[in-house]
Amino acid sequence: MPYIKYIQNGDHYKEVLSKVSKVKESVWIGTADIKDLYIGDRPFLGVLSDLLKSGKEVRLLHAKEPGPIFREEFDRYPVLAKNLERALCPRIHFKMIVFDYREVYIGSANLTGAGIGMKSAARRNFEAGILTDDFGLVDAACEQFDKVWRGGHCKECGRKDFCGDPII
């Protein structure tokens, strides 16, 4: 029986972000904003690096280039430059994480400390989303992500002037 769980505020860190390191095959991440983020005392990019080293697929879609701290962290993990599948699209505003094509988080939280991360309760954003293994929702999220990933919107896009790294 499928489940749908409402996720709010700090539960994003406990219920969603903690699942990334446990994927068996792949993780697809879509976010408007991405910043240096930690899981416990470990950089999130270190977690992604470990996944790639163990042969997992990691895809990252985001709307804009991250800041200098993120880029410094990124450079500490050479496997990311080599194996991380990454694309930019300035129209990305969805926030979703697909775990092994079987489970999906869909919600408001960006991949930042104030969004999905572990910023203190007094400083974090108020976020809401769902975590589910409902096939219809997982399939729809995968299709939306993959259509952007394949450049399915690029030909008719009205924001090409803002696209620094076109998908197609």
Residue spans for each PLM region:
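PLD/PLD-like phosphodiesterase catalytic module centered on the HKD motif
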Residues: 1-168
